[in-house]
Amino acid sequence: MKSVLVAAVALVDPDGRVLLAQRPAGKSMAGLWEFPGGKVEPGETPEAALIRELKEELGIDVAAACLAPFSFASHAYPDFHLLMPLYVCRRWKGIVMPRE
């Protein structure tokens, strides 16, 4: 079975609110809620993937030092096995705005 490495992050603002996004219609698992993040490319660290994905998806800049490891998910789907490190981030530069 193919393994897929996806990194995700819980963005927590100063008021303790956590950003979640709803998966759009037409994508697998449409309608479910998820943390921002994405696939880790070959040769890329999970932290580097999150820095890239947060810039692409939300237009914010995050330093690797601001990504704190929090948890880990491992789940077998029919076609692949998901491996997902989850981080927490409480500091970033820019205003969170959806881009995708």
Question: What kind of feature is each model-predicted range?
Answer:
Residues 61-71:
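A short coil-to-beta-strand element that immediately follows conserved catalytic motifs
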Residues 1-18, 39, 72:
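Conserved N-terminal beta-strand and adjoining loop/helix that marks the start
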Residues 4, 13, 71-96:
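Active-site-adjacent beta-strand/loop module that shapes the phosphate/pyrophosphate-binding cleft
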Residues 17-56:
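Conserved Nudix-box catalytic region and its N-terminal flanking loop in Nudix hydrolases
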Residues 1-6, 15, 29-30, 81-83, ...:
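A structure-centric signal for secondary-structure junctions around beta-strands
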Residues 55-60, 93:
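Conserved amphipathic alpha-helical interaction elements at protein-protein interfaces in regulatory
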